[in-house]
């Protein structure tokens, strides 16, 4: 089971792979993350379109009310905090986020493995659903869509391949 926050869901939808992710994995998120997706979907840009794409699949992933302890800090917003709580409560295998700065704190809060969304591409390769070349191309598309080029998250993601 994977718990994914807003940023990870947007990234996966932005590279036209969200359908495949939903077929291969049991995806969960929080009500707060869905609210953030709804806010983002209001924008007429690539992130808004990706957020809308996630929302169009709302019936294919599980949304939980995880707002009872919704943790926030200078590095963790409400969506990330609620997803960390959710991952801990559900005993998720992974919490997926694209907020590299928040990774260590989310790891402590969630009590599970925390990774950036390109780990899902790596998992799809291991499952023989994507080949290396296709996954690498999706990573490059994510880097462009999410403005990751030359950033630490892009470097970390490339290390997966």
Language-model regions: role of each:
Residues 96-97:
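Short beta-strand scaffold positions
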Residues 1-92, 102-105, 136-137, 151-160:
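Active-site-proximal, substrate-binding regions of enzyme catalytic domains
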Residues 103-161:
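Acidic, PIN/NYN-like endoribonuclease modules and their adjacent C-terminal/linker elements
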